[in-house]
Amino acid sequence: MKPSVILYKALPDDLLQRLQEHFTVHQVANLSPQTVDQNAAIFAEAEGLLGSNENVDAALLEKMPRLRATSTISVGYDNFDVDALTARKILLMHTPTVLTETVADTLMALVLSTARRVVEVAERVKAGEWTASIGPDWYGTDVYHKTLGIVGMGRIGMALAQRAHFGFNMPILYNARRHHKEAEERFNARYCDLDTLLQESDFVCLILPLTDETYHLFGAEQFAKMKSSAIFINAGRGPVVDENALIAALQKGEIHAAGLDVFEQEPLSVDSPLLSMANVVAVPHIGSATHETRYGMAACAVDNLIDALQGKVEKNCVNPHVAD
């Protein structure tokens, strides 16, 4: 008899078929308490869980006594109670490598669109404001040769550094938990403390996961240390930034502009002051949102769940010691 798994995110037909070759698959719309209660027997028997964008906490795990592995279609896993999973010896799998290049593309797009005011001036053209040769009020700022500060030099940070160094000849500063020898050798990146990075960078790109240590890492103090001409980019996790402090910094002119793919609350409220600022490019968490990458992430998550329930945790496992 095949193990039972719960799928709470739609999959392409071929990936669903692959999953069904190994498991009895039960599909649900979400992991809300109502859904769990309505499908209590299914959740009680499930050994695997696969999906994204839902919270997996201790309360849910209490309803799933046979759960052995959960696989998320994402690299981030701050919506999972890792301690609760680990205490119950439940493996947590994620997709850390599939989306690297695509997210780096998004970061570079935010750098370019904020610096050159692409969204703002495109909207002005559509509104009929382009009636003569443009003047300084339409101008942006250069990207090439400007200093890029990267906070978080992981896979995505490295991919961004590659684009900035080879494509735009940008000097690169970085701050991370440790020195990154490859970044220093390949891109001539310079490690520095966060204060130095903030004071010297023309673009500050934040690429950090959400943890207890990174929550509100960026606040009023950090924005005050940045150049008034600096542009802030965040494509990591929204709550790493105190959004009210960011709004205040933009309103006071402490920083020049912001390109944001993530927010403290998602979806972003239609009442957010960020949406009324011409110098803010706000996109709806599209970091990995291409057809190719989202398919690759889903395929990786399917393979991860198959591997996990077969006891193979050599890669893509957040808590591999659970299998010991």
UniProtKB/Swiss-Prot annotation:
The protein's enzyme class: oxidoreductase
Active-site residue numbers: R237, E266, H285
Intracellular or extracellular location(s): Cytoplasm
Enzymatic reactions: glycolate + NADP(+) = glyoxylate + NADPH + H(+); (R)-glycerate + NAD(+) = 3-hydroxypyruvate + NADH + H(+); (R)-glycerate + NADP(+) = 3-hydroxypyruvate + NADPH + H(+)
UniProt subunit comment: Homodimer.
Family designation: Belongs to the D-isomer specific 2-hydroxyacid dehydrogenase family. GhrB subfamily.
Listed name of the protein: Glyoxylate/hydroxypyruvate reductase B
Lineage: Bacteria, Pseudomonadati, Pseudomonadota, Gammaproteobacteria, Enterobacterales
Gene name as annotated: ghrB
